[in-house]
Amino acid sequence: MNIIVVGLSHKTAAVEIREKVAFAPTQMEKPLQAVVALPDITEAVIVSTCNRVEIYATTRDVAGGMARIKRFLADYHNVPLELLEKHLYSYHGEDATRHVFRVASSLDSMVVGEPQILGQIKTSYGYAAEYKSSGIILNRFLHKAFSVAKRVRTETKIASSAVSVAFAAVELAKKIFGELSDKTVLLIGAGEMCELAAKHFINTGVRGVMVTNRTYERAEKLAEEFDAKPVHFEALMETLPKADIILSSTGAPHFIIHEKDMEEVLRRRKHKPMFFIDIAVPRDIDPKVNNVENCYLYTVDDLNGVVATNLEQRKVEAAKAEAIVEQEIGQFFKWLSSLEVTPTIVALRTHFDEIRKAELSKTISGWKDLPPGAEKKLDALTNAIMNKLLHQPTSVLKRIDQGNRNDLYVDALRNLFDLEVGGESQDNMMELED
């Protein structure tokens, strides 16, 4: 069984493309069930964040599985495959494992070392577990990824010099305005990113913070935590003129602020500049807002320059983290190999033993005047011959590396001897220790 990854990220696709294939976190059941319904796809997890959309799956048909998932992404989101495909990457085997371990450890993030991605993958895995699209392989795979991320955070200092996307957004605001003590901030959304942004804005000494969310109770809760002012979402347009800085991070599937809204907002502000930071994917703010005089709109893709701080120190720590990832890949594949190899060895020995016993029984039943103890000796002799014959193929199977060669050996044995490999036992499925 092969693990495959198909996806795109901030490295391969601009936000205009990423938002086209983003999945709403509250509506994961339908796409997860659709992926595992694809031919030869047995398990699936979907990860959808502001910086990446990835599907992790298991299949015996690597090329076919990747092609079907690419087609699924295009068809599900009504995006032409030829437009999407040039932004997609795909991995299998060790490359897939390395990629996911690196993503979970924040080595592939826009902000290397940021902690948010691990929580986002855990949430994605939670949906897959809830809707039963993940099984024994992806369950173990992602638990191992979480373990790798924990090792990276505890054994390196990669997180100590990292900045979050929210922090980068605040730093960008400081670069635009300089002094923020006379500025009022409006946060649209009440999730983790807005919570982090609230913390950073408060620390910079802004004049005030307002929070709005479709669920007013969540806005109230976040506002209370930071001594901010909660605002009903229905009052968004009336509230905008009071804000100098607007940071938006909701899960809305469409724009919540449009170009046509801004003329009246700016008139009421006497055309004082407004700074918009849209870190939502799909985007919350119509990009045409940037065409309005005195409106300055930035997206998550504009934060790259800010996150370059402390880059050299993070490179040193990232090298240590990469070594941990490589070490853990070997451990995981040792476990994954056992899922294929152990049941095949058991089936092979059972197959030979059944033949041995059948032939021995025929021989003994046609042998008159069998000396006392001969049956026992013949049984031992034939068993020893069988063990000698099976020793070499068994040893080879146990020591070869997991990968394409392993699949070839296992498949060849199963086909040559028409082996029926049943469900793996719990002993064979024992997880590696974290």
Curated annotation (Swiss-Prot):
Enzyme type, top EC level: oxidoreductase
GO terms of biological process kind: protoporphyrinogen IX biosynthetic process from glutamate
Parts of the chain that traverse the membrane: none
Single GO MF descriptor: NADP binding
EC numbers on record: 1.2.1.70
Record's keyword terms, sorted: NADP, Oxidoreductase, Porphyrin biosynthesis
Disulfide bond listed as a keyword: no
Catalytic activity: (S)-4-amino-5-oxopentanoate + tRNA(Glu) + NADP(+) = L-glutamyl-tRNA(Glu) + NADPH + H(+)
Pfam families associated with the record: GlutR_dimer, GlutR_N, Shikimate_DH
Oxidoreductase listed as a keyword: yes
Site entry (Important for activity), positions: H99
Residues binding NADP(+), per UniProt: G189, A190, G191, E192, M193, C194
Note: During catalysis, the active site Cys acts as a nucleophile attacking the alpha-carbonyl group of tRNA-bound glutamate with the formation of a thioester intermediate between enzyme and glutamate, and the concomitant release of tRNA(Glu). The thioester intermediate is finally reduced by direct hydride transfer from NADPH, to form the product GSA.
The family this protein is said to belong to: Belongs to the glutamyl-tRNA reductase family.
Assembly description: Homodimer.
UniProt name for this protein: Glutamyl-tRNA reductase
Organism: Citrifermentans bemidjiense (strain ATCC BAA-1014 / DSM 16622 / JCM 12645 / Bem) (Geobacter bemidjiensis)
Taxonomy of the source species: Bacteria, Pseudomonadati, Thermodesulfobacteriota, Desulfuromonadia, Geobacterales
Gene: hemA
